């Protein structure tokens, strides 16, 4: 009885691990999409709507997207200062 219980609990742990991996892998394409949408924004930087949208999307999907979106926002604000030439890279 205890052997069967431990095997079933191991099976549950594996299924939980798989579902976590799926959720993280599903959030990485959206973080790259938000990176692309900010990267190709005008020289003035991202609009407030884009920044708020990325932050709200990050709260709904996971903390990795929040960190990525904040770093991308900082990059787009400092990029025109460090590289004054405008346009997509």
From Swiss-Prot:
InterPro entries per UniProt: HssA/B-related
Signal peptide residue numbers: none
Which is a Pfam family this sequence falls into?
Coiled
Hey, which family's this protein in?
Belongs to the hssA/B family.
PANTHER family xrefs: HSSA/B-LIKE PROTEIN 17-RELATED, HSSA_B-LIKE PROTEIN 17-RELATED
- Which protein, by its recorded name, is this? HssA/B-like protein DDB_G0295685
Q: What is the lineage of its organism?
A: Eukaryota, Amoebozoa, Evosea, Eumycetozoa, Dictyostelia
């Amino acid at each position: 009885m205890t052997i069967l219980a431990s095997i079933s609990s191991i099976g549950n742990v594996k299924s939980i691990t798989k579902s976590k991996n799926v959720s993280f892998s599903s959030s990485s394409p959206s973080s790259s999409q938000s990176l692309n949408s900010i990267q190709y924004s005008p020289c003035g930087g991202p609009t407030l709507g884009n920044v708020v949208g990325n932050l709200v999307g990050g709260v709904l999907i996971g903390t990795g997207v929040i960190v990525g979106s904040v770093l991308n926002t900082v990059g787009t604000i400092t990029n025109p200062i460090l590289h004054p030439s405008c346009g997509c890279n």
